């Protein structure tokens, strides 16, 4: 009987480390960014019309229940996008641009234009986002936001907390790309 309780206890301890899975895509419950452990705050599937486009995951040092808490959180952050279908670089660039414009003021957009231009150039250089491709945006306060594609850094970090906050607003802003995706990234149901 003690063995059963020990095994049950070990299973319960391991459960928080198990991956979350959406549409066959596994997302780790915890990740390391710049030596700091981040936890999966929420995950969701981005849809457009009837098409499932990508699985998104938001990682933060401390769980956040509101968009403001997530956007303003101190320390490293990570957004993971795993493609569920192919998308051209132009489609991806247009989607990011539309999300930035819908959720940031003209002044905020102007302030991060150099970083936005860098990100768009990196996306164009990568080319088509293929089904299964893992796109990661890691933010490290002293460095900036780094784009990774399938684990490979693309270019150098794009400086500034304001840029990272502008990007997060694409998914968490007042007019997010998808409302139920925002709610799920903040720990709610999708």
Model-derived segments and their meaning:
Residues 2-10:
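Sec-dependent signal peptide recognition
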Residues 15-19:
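Sec/Tat signal peptide C-region and signal peptidase I cleavage site
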Residues 20-72:
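N-terminal structural module
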Residues 27, 36, 54-56, 75-79, ...:
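Envelope-exposed proteins and targeting segments
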Residues 64-142:
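Mid-length scaffold segments of soluble, non-membrane domains
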Residues 149-152:
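Short strand-turn-strand beta-turns centered on an Asx-Gly dipeptide
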Residues 154-181:
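Flexible glycine-rich active-site/ligand-binding loops centered on an Asp-His dyad
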Residues 179-190:
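Cysteine/selenocysteine-centered motifs that mediate thiol-based redox chemistry or coordinate metal-sulfur cofactors
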């Amino acid at each position: 009987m003690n063995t059963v309780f020990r095994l049950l206890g070990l299973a319960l301890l391991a459960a928080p480390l198990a991956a979350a899975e959406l549409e066959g895509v596994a997302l780790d419950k915890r990740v390391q960014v710049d030596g700091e452990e981040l936890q999966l705050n929420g995950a969701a599937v981005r849809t457009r019309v009837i098409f499932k486009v990508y699985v998104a995951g938001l990682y933060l040092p401390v769980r956040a229940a509101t968009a403001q808490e997530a956007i303003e959180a101190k320390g490293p952050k990570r957004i993971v996008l795993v493609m569920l279908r192919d998308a051209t670089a132009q489609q991806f660039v247009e989607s990011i641009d539309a999300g930035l414009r819908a959720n940031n003021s003209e002044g905020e957009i102007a302030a991060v234009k150099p970083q936005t231009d860098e990100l768009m150039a990196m996306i164009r250089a990568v080319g088509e986002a293929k089904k299964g491709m893992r796109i990661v945006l890691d933010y490290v306060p002293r460095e900036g936001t780094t784009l990774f594609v399938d684990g490979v850094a693309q270019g150098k970090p794009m400086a500034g907390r304001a840029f990272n906050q502008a990007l997060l607003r694409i998914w968490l802003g007042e007019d997010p790309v998808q409302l139920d995706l925002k709610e799920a990234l903040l720990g709610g149901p999708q």
